[in-house]
């Protein structure tokens, strides 16, 4: 019967041995004398209202690297982005409809506009 070891195992070797399968590279350093202004200001101000962000207060993040001073600012930016996406998809849908419209009846166009109206109702803030 063969003995099989499972788990972590400490392997020691003499460091004076030259192993052909080991490559040692130093890390790369980018020598940039002028960093972007966005790099210098990362999480310094709210992305929406430009209020200064403080280290002792909560920062509300959105899409990975956008910081906001409050939930309201973050949610407003989310609504703005959703509206932009809706407008872009609406334009694409209308362009597609116009290309594919081969004498289609009024009922199809009415269904399309009713669908768009319903989608826009989702973004109306009371």
Swiss-Prot record:
InterPro entries registered for this protein in UniProt: FLZ17/18 (IPR044181), Zf-FLZ_dom (IPR007650)
Origin superkingdom: Eukaryota
Cellular component terms per the entry's GO annotation: cytoplasm; cytosol; nucleus
Zinc finger (FLZ-type): 41-85
Keywords from the named record: Cytoplasm, Metal-binding, Nucleus, Zinc, Zinc-finger
An annotated GO BP: response to abscisic acid
GO molecular function, one term: zinc ion binding
Function: May act as an adapter to facilitate the interaction of SnRK1 complex with effector proteins, conferring tissue- and stimulus-type specific differences in the SnRK1 regulation pathway.
Entry similarity comment: Belongs to the FLZ family.
Protein name stated in the entry: FCS-Like Zinc finger 17
Organism: Arabidopsis thaliana
Gene (UniProt): FLZ17
